[in-house]
């Protein structure tokens, strides 16, 4: 399997900077992208997969759906549209807004 290049992840994070709150974390050679504390996208094999939401689907219009990795649920595969900083920042913002808040971690007693 290929992994994602850090340079590609840094480029995407820069493209998404308009959201004001992008973070990413390396997981198994790939990256999870966070916006406002929610996982909004995965970057696998240098491809961007945005979590599917109704609002994101409406914004994209006719998204390409594909699993980020074998066995995963489908995500929205974003191919060249991330070259447009305003567009990708808006999609990430919409996705973060539409996703449920992260579940608080149960404290072990």
Predicted segments, located by residue:
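Charge-dense, helix-prone N-terminal extensions
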Residues: 1-109
